[in-house]
């Protein structure tokens, strides 16, 4: 490769990445998932588009795809709160194993019939498209405020179902390559346990060692993110090399790092955010370049039928069976999880496996997988806002600062600076600072008014459009948000929880005269205990129950227990 070729590569890569970034603004305007924009840019630059770039190197696509997925999952794991496992771990694992197997079987049967393949070849297509995609799920759910049970289940499922899909795909490729048509159940179970066991063990063990290394190393601040990423990739590669799931390993590594005190945590998350965007852009650009629309047209109708079968039948059936043991999922939540079976880069990367193995019909497998992913992203991704409203799984977004940054003062304390802009409707407008009931341990460190820095004192009165800088901890965000945050723009309205928020510790006998309640059978219970008894374990914000003509909604949680309960009349619509 000469200097001119290398420079041309830099030129084309910079143009494609820049175009993807600029065109990403169309995503919100047109209601199209941003990943489709990246994919479309790659296809337009490809051999059938105006760009005319011929790209058919599946090994490079495999390399880029795995590298990008590893970074995306590391970032996703670091942003996942381990507290969400309280409500979603076992349901997500059920969907990641039983759900993927059922989806693979049902989709494989349909694929064999639609494309006139034998059963094993059809099952290979089912395995390739059988898992949800972490990149798509993290990207499309990241901007939506869904109830924790639903969002955590989808995110943990997408981060942990790839071992099952990889296991099924590799096993079926080996069967087809050796012309065997029977499978040894014991061998399959051993391989599956190897994928999950090594992935979980090395991911958590390696993550703990990486955490100790990061916190003990004395480095320049900008080097900690590089150490985190390189360590995560090392764990990913080592796990894959010994036959485990590297994808699961790096996700668990990120989960462990994100939930422990970590040196230069804020800088690391900021760098990872940029790397994740670059990974998504690069991965979908390469996959778009790899696709040839003229090769998709001959299989468009059967591939569309397969995609609709998977979306409308295979995925819902697998979700309802996978969630059967978990009674706290409402039917509307099950339907929404069924609909958000987003396919993305993982099926396309898995479709590269048969190409690299030289299997017959390998190009067909790739084209079908690409078409199914395209339909899933466009149909399911674009309808996600509507589906979340219809299923009523959205909850009001918690008030948040307009900016936050870490203060590397003490490794264990994790101090942060939160920046708030005051709006007209905040009750604190006109109040002196001394009258604010700030959370214990927080302090206003700066006040900006009309672009000037003021020196606040206890007598300083707040005005609209003031910008406050507050030092505190992440645990202080709910209380600070109630004081200072602007209300997020959303369609849920201010009365989602009701006109009144009641303390969960309130006794029902005290509430009875206020709301005309008959509490003769539950007079000795608190409101929170009664709601928990009605709704079951693992409550999340947004859970509600109808009782005596009123809707009682969990409005705030504290360490797994309801803290505040909203109440509204049955005929009121919160949407």
From Swiss-Prot:
<feature type="transmembrane region" description="Helical">
    <location>
        <begin position="3"/>
        <end position="23"/>
    </location>
</feature>
<feature type="domain" description="RCK C-terminal">
    <location>
        <begin position="404"/>
        <end position="486"/>
    </location>
</feature>
<comment type="similarity">
    <text>Belongs to the monovalent cation:proton antiporter 1 (CPA1) transporter (TC 2.A.36) family. NhaP2 subfamily.</text>
</comment>
<feature type="transmembrane region" description="Helical">
    <location>
        <begin position="271"/>
        <end position="291"/>
    </location>
</feature>
<keyword id="KW-1003">Cell membrane</keyword>
<keyword id="KW-0813">Transport</keyword>
<feature type="transmembrane region" description="Helical">
    <location>
        <begin position="335"/>
        <end position="355"/>
    </location>
</feature>
<dbReference type="GO" id="GO:0006884">
    <property type="term" value="P:cell volume homeostasis"/>
</dbReference>
<dbReference type="InterPro" id="IPR038770">
    <property type="entry name" value="Na+/solute_symporter_sf"/>
</dbReference>
<keyword id="KW-0050">Antiport</keyword>
<feature type="transmembrane region" description="Helical">
    <location>
        <begin position="95"/>
        <end position="115"/>
    </location>
</feature>
<dbReference type="InterPro" id="IPR036721">
    <property type="entry name" value="RCK_C_sf"/>
</dbReference>
<protein>
    <recommendedName>
        <fullName>K(+)/H(+) antiporter NhaP2</fullName>
    </recommendedName>
</protein>
<dbReference type="InterPro" id="IPR006037">
    <property type="entry name" value="RCK_C"/>
</dbReference>
<dbReference type="GO" id="GO:0015386">
    <property type="term" value="F:potassium:proton antiporter activity"/>
</dbReference>
<keyword id="KW-0633">Potassium transport</keyword>
<feature type="transmembrane region" description="Helical">
    <location>
        <begin position="53"/>
        <end position="73"/>
    </location>
</feature>
<keyword id="KW-0406">Ion transport</keyword>
<keyword id="KW-0630">Potassium</keyword>
<keyword id="KW-0472">Membrane</keyword>
<keyword id="KW-1133">Transmembrane helix</keyword>
<dbReference type="InterPro" id="IPR016169">
    <property type="entry name" value="FAD-bd_PCMH_sub2"/>
</dbReference>
<keyword id="KW-0812">Transmembrane</keyword>
<feature type="transmembrane region" description="Helical">
    <location>
        <begin position="364"/>
        <end position="384"/>
    </location>
</feature>
<dbReference type="InterPro" id="IPR006153">
    <property type="entry name" value="Cation/H_exchanger_TM"/>
</dbReference>
<feature type="transmembrane region" description="Helical">
    <location>
        <begin position="196"/>
        <end position="216"/>
    </location>
</feature>
<dbReference type="Pfam" id="PF00999">
    <property type="entry name" value="Na_H_Exchanger"/>
</dbReference>
<dbReference type="InterPro" id="IPR036318">
    <property type="entry name" value="FAD-bd_PCMH-like_sf"/>
</dbReference>
<feature type="transmembrane region" description="Helical">
    <location>
        <begin position="122"/>
        <end position="142"/>
    </location>
</feature>
<comment type="function">
    <text>K(+)/H(+) antiporter that extrudes potassium in exchange for external protons and maintains the internal concentration of potassium under toxic levels.</text>
</comment>
<feature type="transmembrane region" description="Helical">
    <location>
        <begin position="304"/>
        <end position="324"/>
    </location>
</feature>
<dbReference type="Pfam" id="PF02080">
    <property type="entry name" value="TrkA_C"/>
</dbReference>
<dbReference type="GO" id="GO:0050660">
    <property type="term" value="F:flavin adenine dinucleotide binding"/>
</dbReference>
<dbReference type="InterPro" id="IPR005170">
    <property type="entry name" value="Transptr-assoc_dom"/>
</dbReference>
<dbReference type="InterPro" id="IPR023729">
    <property type="entry name" value="NhaP2"/>
</dbReference>
<feature type="transmembrane region" description="Helical">
    <location>
        <begin position="232"/>
        <end position="252"/>
    </location>
</feature>
<feature type="transmembrane region" description="Helical">
    <location>
        <begin position="30"/>
        <end position="50"/>
    </location>
</feature>
<dbReference type="Pfam" id="PF03471">
    <property type="entry name" value="CorC_HlyC"/>
</dbReference>
<keyword id="KW-0997">Cell inner membrane</keyword>
<dbReference type="GO" id="GO:0005886">
    <property type="term" value="C:plasma membrane"/>
</dbReference>
């Amino acid at each position: 490769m000469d200097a001119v070729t290398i420079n041309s590569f830099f030129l084309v890569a910079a143009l494609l990445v820049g175009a993807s970034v600029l065109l990403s603004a169309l995503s919100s305007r047109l209601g199209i998932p941003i990943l489709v924009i990246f994919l479309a840019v790659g296809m337009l630059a490809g051999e059938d588009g105006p760009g005319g770039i011929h790209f058919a190197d599946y090994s490079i696509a495999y390399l880029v795809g795995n590298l990008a997925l590893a970074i995306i999952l590391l970032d996703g794991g670091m942003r996942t709160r381990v507290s969400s496992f309280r409500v979603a771990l076992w349901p997500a694992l059920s969907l990641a194993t039983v759900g993927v197997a059922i989806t693979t079987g049902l989709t494989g049967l349909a694929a064999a019939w639609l494309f006139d393949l034998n059963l094993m070849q059809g099952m290979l297509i089912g395995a390739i498209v059988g898992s949800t995609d972490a990149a798509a799920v993290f990207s499309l759910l990241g901007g939506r405020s869904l109830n924790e049970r639903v969002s955590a289940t989808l995110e943990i499922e997408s981060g942990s179902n790839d071992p099952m899909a990889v296991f099924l795909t590799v096993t079926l490729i080996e069967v087809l390559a050796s012309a065997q048509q029977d499978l040894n159940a014991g061998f399959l179970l051993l391989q599956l346990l190897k994928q999950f066991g090594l992935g979980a063990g090395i991911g958590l063990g390696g993550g703990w060692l990486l955490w100790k290394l990061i916190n003990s190393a004395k480095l320049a601040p900008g080097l900690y993110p590089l150490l985190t990423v390189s360590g995560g990739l090392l764990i990913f590669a080592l796990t894959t090399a010994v036959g485990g799931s590297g994808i699961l390993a790096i996700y668990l590594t990120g989960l462990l790092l994100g939930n422990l005190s970590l040196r230069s945590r804020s800088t690391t998350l900021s760098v990872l955010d940029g790397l994740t965007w670059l990974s998504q852009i690069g991965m979908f650009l390469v996959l778009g370049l790899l696709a040839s629309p003229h090769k998709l047209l001959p299989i468009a109708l059967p591939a569309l039928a397969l995609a609709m079968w998977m979306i409308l039948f295979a995925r819902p059936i697998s979700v309802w069976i996978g969630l059967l043991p978990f009674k706290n999922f409402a039917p509307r939540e099950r339907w929404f999880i069924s609909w958000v079976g987003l396919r993305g880069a993982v099926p396309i990367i898995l479709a590269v496996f048969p190409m690299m193995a030289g299997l017959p019909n390998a190009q067909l497998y790739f084209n079908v997988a690409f078409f199914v992913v395209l339909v899933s992203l466009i149909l399911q991704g674009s309808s996600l806002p509507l589906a979340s409203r219809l299923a009523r799984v959205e909850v009001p977004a918690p008030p948040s600062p307009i900016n936050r940054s870490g203060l590397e003062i003490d490794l264990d304390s994790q101090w942060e600076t939160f920046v708030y802009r005051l709006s007209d409707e905040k009750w604190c407008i006109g109040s002196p600072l001394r009258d604010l009931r700030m959370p214990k341990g927080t302090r206003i460190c700066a006040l900006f008014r009309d672009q000037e820095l003021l020196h606040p004192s206890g007598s300083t009165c707040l005005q609209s459009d003031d910008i406050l800088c507050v030092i505190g901890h992440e645990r202080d965000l709910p209380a600070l948000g109630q004081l200072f945050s602007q209300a997020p723009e959303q369609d849920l309205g201010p009365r989602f929880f009701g006109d009144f928020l009641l303390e969960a510790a309130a006794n029902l006998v005290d509430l009875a005269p206020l709301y005309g309640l008959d509490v003769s059978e539950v007079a000795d219970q608190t409101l929170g205990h009664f709601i928990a008894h009605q709704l079951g374990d693992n409550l999340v914000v947004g859970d509600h129950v109808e009782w005596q003509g009123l809707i009682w909604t969990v409005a705030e949680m504290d360490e797994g227990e309801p803290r505040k309960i909203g109440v509204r009349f049955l005929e009121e619509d919160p949407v």
